[in-house]
Swiss-Prot record:
Source lineage: Bacteria, Bacillati, Bacillota, Clostridia, Moorellales
Positions that bind (6S)-5,6,7,8-tetrahydrofolate: S109, L110, L111, P112
Protein name: Methionyl-tRNA formyltransferase
UniProt organism field: Moorella thermoacetica (strain ATCC 39073 / JCM 9320)
Keywords: Protein biosynthesis, Transferase
Known EC number: 2.1.2.9
UniProt KW Disulfide bond keyword: no
Length: 311
């Protein structure tokens, strides 16, 4: 089929690569403009742009999806299907109605659960044991289109958002290829979503990065996993942010002063939560790279009884 592919971050790259390998024709790959990134704020291309150019595909980077010149260019491309994977922009009704076969989207949850911008983060932070990917026919409402296919993926109890992200990106790419095979054969289903079961995954807020030690250890553990690798959960030590990237649950029924360091050992340091304790194994101090907690303790010694956070 003749496609227009819309996507931006790493999550969309396996899907683009899989569709190229499947032999589809690309009228264009549309992605967001280059952005300044890193400490030097160097202007860098989105991962999808780099992948598309390496494959010899034509790339468009509109700054305004409602620009008349862009919309006319899109119309002249005459795509049979628009495929959207983590594009990061809302498509107007005019765009949704443009391709002959419609627009399809790959979403990183088992819809109608976790509609919205941060489905993987939210699933891990909420302690879900299962997630998945969904392909759907796009509708004007947020992630509310009819479902085509779904594939489930377990969330291991120690898994991070980064690990689940990478796995879903690969699983989703395969599901998308299968979805397009069904569409090409005019056999793709349209399964309406049950609105009564819909839940939402809004963008992360800065205050959600703060560890509140008075919460149960399991809740904090899920927060640490859910915010790894980005943006990272943090506590305060001597007024400075200390990001925590790795931890293990210990002493699930232990109680005591929340935020108190109860033990410092070879693997890291143990902190008392509202209920239960956490052995912190990986941290990132200000201006430094992520490091084992044992290495951190060599440069920043810690003693039992120290209080972390704002509790």
């Amino acid at each position: 089929m003749r496609l227009v592919f819309m996507g931006t971050p790493d999550f969309a790259v396996p899907s683009l690569q899989a569709l190229v390998a499947a032999g589809h024709e690309f009228a264009a790959v549309i992605t967001q403009p280059d952005r300044p990134r890193g400490r030097g704020k160097k202007l860098l291309p989105p991962p999808v742009k780099s992948t598309a150019l390496a494959a010899g595909l034509p790339v468009r980077q509109p700054s305004d999806m409602k620009d008349r010149e862009f919309l006319e260019d899109l119309r002249l491309l005459q795509p049979e299907l628009i495929v959207v994977v983590a594009f990061g922009r809302i498509l107007s009704r005019e765009i949704l109605d443009l391709p002959a076969r419609g627009c399809v989207n790959l979403h990183a949850s088992l819809l109608p659960r976790y509609r919205g911008a941060a489905p993987i983060h939210r699933a891990v932070m909420n302690g879900e044991v299962e997630t998945g990917v969904t392909t759907m026919w796009m509708a004007p409402q947020l992630d509310a289109g009819d479902i085509i296919l779904q594939e489930k993926l377990p969330i291991p109890p120690e898994a991070t958002t980064g690990e689940i992200h990478d796995r879903l990106a690969e699983v989703g790419a395969g599901l998308l290829v299968h979805t397009l095979e069904l569409i090409a054969a005019s056999r793709a289903p349209r399964l309406p979503q049950d609105e009564a079961l819909a839940t939402y995954a809004p963008p992360l807020k800065p205050e959600e990065e703060v560890i509140h030690w008075e919460q149960p250890a399991q809740v904090i553990y899920n927060q640490i996993r859910g915010l790894n690798p980005w943006p990272g959960a943090y506590t305060l030590r001597s007024g400075e942010r200390l990001k925590i990237y790795g931890a293990r649950l210990t002493d699930p029924s232990a109680i005591g002063r929340a935020g108190r360091v109860v033990e410092v050992g070879r693997e890291g340091f143990v902190v008392q939560a509202g209920t239960g304790r956490l052995l912190v194994t990986s941290v990132q101090p200000p201006g430094k790279k992520i490091m084992p907690a044992s290495a951190y303790l060599q440069g920043y010694p810690m003693v039992p009884g120290e209080i972390l956070g704002c509790v």
